[in-house]
Structure formats: structure tokens, C-alpha cells
Swiss-Prot record:
The keyword Protein transport does not apply. The N-terminus is blocked. Part of the SNARE core complex containing SNAP25, VAMP2 and STX1A; this complex binds CPLX1. Found in a complex containing SYT1, SV2B and syntaxin-1. Found in a ternary complex with STX1A and VAMP8. Interacts with HSC70 and with SYT9, forming a complex with DNAJC5. The interaction with SYT9 is inhibited in presence of calcium. Isoform 1 and isoform 2 interact with BLOC1S6. Interacts with CENPF. Interacts with EQTN. Interacts with HGS. Interacts with KCNB1 (via N-terminus); reduces the voltage-dependent potassium channel KCNB1 activity in pancreatic beta cells. Interacts with OTOF. It is found in: Cytoplasm, Perinuclear region; Cell membrane; Synapse, Synaptosome; Photoreceptor inner segment. This is Synaptosomal-associated protein 25. GO terms for cellular component: cytoplasm; membrane; neuron projection; perinuclear region of cytoplasm; photoreceptor inner segment; plasma membrane; SNARE complex; synapse. It is a lipid-anchor. Belongs to the SNAP-25 family. It comes from the Eukaryota. The keyword Cytoplasm applies.
Amino acid sequence: MLQLVEESSKDAGIRXLVMLDEQGEQLERVVDEREQMAISGGFIRIMEKMLGSG
């Protein structure tokens, strides 16, 4: 019985670590996308100023 509980706990721990790793990867993608949007937004503002429409 104790061995079953230990195995279940180990499995739950492994699943939790896998989920945390996946969430970390998702967060990384979100941060990268936000940075890209900020770069694009900055570029658009610069172009608007250069064209006299901003």
C-alpha cells in the first residue's frame, strides 16, 4: 500500500514538473511576442513621424 502511494506521489510530481516546464515555454513565447509587438509599434511610430502623419 505504501509503495502504491509513493509511486502515485512520484507520478504526480513528474506531471507537475512537466506542466511547469510547458508553462515556462508558453510564457517565453508570450514575452517574445510582446517584445516583437513593441519593436513593431516603435517602428510604426518612427515611420509616422518621418512621414509627418504622427
